[in-house]
């Protein structure tokens, strides 16, 4: 059965907890990814966004909880950054060919889809930030994934190139008919196309569709009202709340006068 024929989940994360040296990095995370969906993860620095991606990518085992993968799942991953050894120059084509089991035609197709065929003989070390991100995206789609995981995909890209890169990501998603899970701080650009937004600060503080977020104070408290009309969320009950810096500002026993969160 083809993975897109019915709406079976691609990945399910159930009650994921991650603890580092008795400090909770993730707490009770539940997330289900379906075919063709676009989910954007936002949250303060140190809130656990990258940790969540590592758990999903099997780079980090959760302390507790379960990750369930569809048996035909293929994941493509674009990291936030990649370390290049400038003493060992390598061309774009050679870099892409390092991925096992990939044909030259698949490499050419990926470069063509991202409009960077002209870069195939260029040295990886001499690429601009935008060119490098396109190459990393090309590498991620070589196996024609049905889930594309992007960690800050516009890292190192100037502001003029960010909107163009996001448009390219959307076009790639449509061409491959894949789902996207993306960590991003460029909320004013990505929110228009995302199906769901998750705001994470160790736990899921808020989540939902972009159309229903406009006046919710929780998201505004984190990111400001300039993004509010593009993001949706729900609020949930727990025994603490966070201020704009991610610190606990009030509990069920003590309500800070400055806290704008709702029970």
Swiss-Prot record:
One Pfam family in the UniProt entry: ABC_tran
Subcellular location: Cell inner membrane
SMART domains: AAA
Quaternary structure and partners: The complex is composed of two ATP-binding proteins (ZnuC), two transmembrane proteins (ZnuB) and a solute-binding protein (ZnuA).
Alphabetically ordered keywords of this record: ATP-binding, Cell inner membrane, Cell membrane, Ion transport, Membrane, Nucleotide-binding, Translocase, Transport, Zinc, Zinc transport
InterPro entries: AAA+_ATPase (IPR003593), ABC_transporter-like_ATP-bd (IPR003439), ABC_transporter-like_CS (IPR017871), Metal_Ion_Import_ABC (IPR050153), P-loop_NTPase (IPR027417)
Residues that bind ATP: 43-50
Protein name: Zinc import ATP-binding protein ZnuC
Family indicated by similarity: Belongs to the ABC transporter superfamily. Zinc importer (TC 3.A.1.15.5) family.
Highest rank taxon of the organism: Bacteria
UniProt catalytic activity: Zn(2+)(out) + ATP(in) + H2O(in) = Zn(2+)(in) + ADP(in) + phosphate(in) + H(+)(in)
PANTHER family registered for this protein in UniProt: METAL TRANSPORT SYSTEM ATP-BINDING PROTEIN TM_0124-RELATED (PTHR42734), ZINC IMPORT ATP-BINDING PROTEIN ZNUC (PTHR42734:SF9)
Swiss-Prot/TrEMBL GO biological process terms: response to zinc ion
Domain ABC transporter stretches: 11-226
Membrane topology field: Peripheral membrane protein
Main location: membrane
Annotated EC: 7.2.2.20
């Amino acid at each position: 059965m083809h993975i897109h024929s019915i709406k079976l989940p691609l990945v399910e994360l159930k009650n994921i907890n991650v603890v580092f040296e008795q400090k909770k990095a993730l707490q009770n995370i539940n997330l289900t990814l379906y075919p063709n969906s676009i989910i954007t993860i936002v949250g303060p620095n140190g809130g656990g966004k990258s940790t969540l991606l590592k758990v999903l990518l099997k780079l980090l085992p959760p302390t507790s909880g379960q990750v369930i993968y569809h048996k035909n799942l293929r994941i493509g991953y674009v990291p936030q950054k990649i370390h290049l050894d400038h003493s060992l120059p390598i061309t774009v084509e050679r870099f892409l060919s390092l991925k096992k089991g990939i044909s030259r035609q698949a490499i050419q197709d990926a470069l063509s889809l991202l409009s960077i065929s002209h870069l195939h003989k260029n040295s990886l070390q001499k690429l601009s930030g935008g060119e490098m991100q396109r190459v990393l995206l090309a590498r991620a789609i070589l196996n024609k994934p049905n889930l594309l995981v992007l960690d800050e995909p516009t890292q190192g890209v100037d502001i003029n190139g960010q909107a163009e890169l996001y448009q390219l990501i959307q076009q790639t998603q449509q061409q491959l008919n894949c789902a996207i899970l993306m960590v991003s701080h460029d909320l004013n650009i990505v929110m228009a196309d995302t199906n769901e937004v998750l705001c994470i600060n160790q736990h899921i503080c808020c989540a939902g569709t972009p159309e229903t977020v406009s006046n919710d104070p929780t998201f505004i408290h984190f990111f400001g009202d300039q993004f509010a009309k593009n993001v949706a969320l729900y609020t949930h009950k727990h025994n603490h709340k966070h201020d704009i810096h991610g610190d606990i500002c009030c509990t069920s026993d003590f309500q800070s006068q400055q806290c704008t969160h709702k029970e």
